[in-house]
Amino acid sequence: GTVYVFLLLLAFGIFTDISNACSEQMDDEDSYEVEKRGNACIEVCLQHTGNPAECDKPCDK
C-alpha cells in the first residue's frame, strides 16, 4: 500500500512540475506578445503624432 501511495505522489509531483513549466512558458510567450504589440502600437502612434509622450498612454506603456 505504501509503495503505491509513494508512486502516486511521485507521479503527481512530476505532473505538477511539467504543468508548472508549461504554464511558465505560456506566461513568457504572453508577455512577449504584449510587449511586441505595445512596441508596434508606439511605432504606429509615432508615425501619426511624432510625439512619444502622447503614445505612452494609449499604448499602455
Swiss-Prot record:
Molecular function terms from GO: potassium channel regulator activity; toxin activity
Signal peptide annotation: 1-21
GO CC term (a single one): extracellular region
Domain of life: Eukaryota
Keywords tagged on the record: Cleavage on pair of basic residues, Disulfide bond, Ion channel impairing toxin, Neurotoxin, Potassium channel impairing toxin, Secreted, Signal, Toxin, Voltage-gated potassium channel impairing toxin
Primary location recorded for the protein, binned into one broad class: secreted
Localization annotation: Secreted
Tissue: Expressed by the venom gland.
Prodomain residues: 22-35
Disulfide-linked positions: 41-59, 45-55
Family of this protein: Belongs to the short scorpion toxin superfamily. Potassium channel inhibitor kappa-KTx family. Kappa-KTx 2 subfamily.
Function: Voltage-gated potassium channel inhibitor (Kv) that acts on Kv1.3/KCNA3 and Kv7.1/KCNQ1. 1 uM of the toxin inhibits Kv1.3/KCNA3 currents by 35.1%, whereas 10 uM of the toxin inhibits Kv7.1/KCNQ1 currents by 44.9%.
Remaining remarks: Negative results: does not show activity on ion channels KCa2.3/KCNN3, TRPV1, and KCa1.1/KCNMA1.
Description of its domains: Has the structural arrangement of two alpha-helices stabilized by disulfide bonds (CSalpha/alpha 2(S-S)).
Protein name according to UniProt: Potassium channel toxin kappa-KTx 2.8
Naturally occurring in which organism (per UniProt): Heterometrus petersii (Asian forest scorpion)
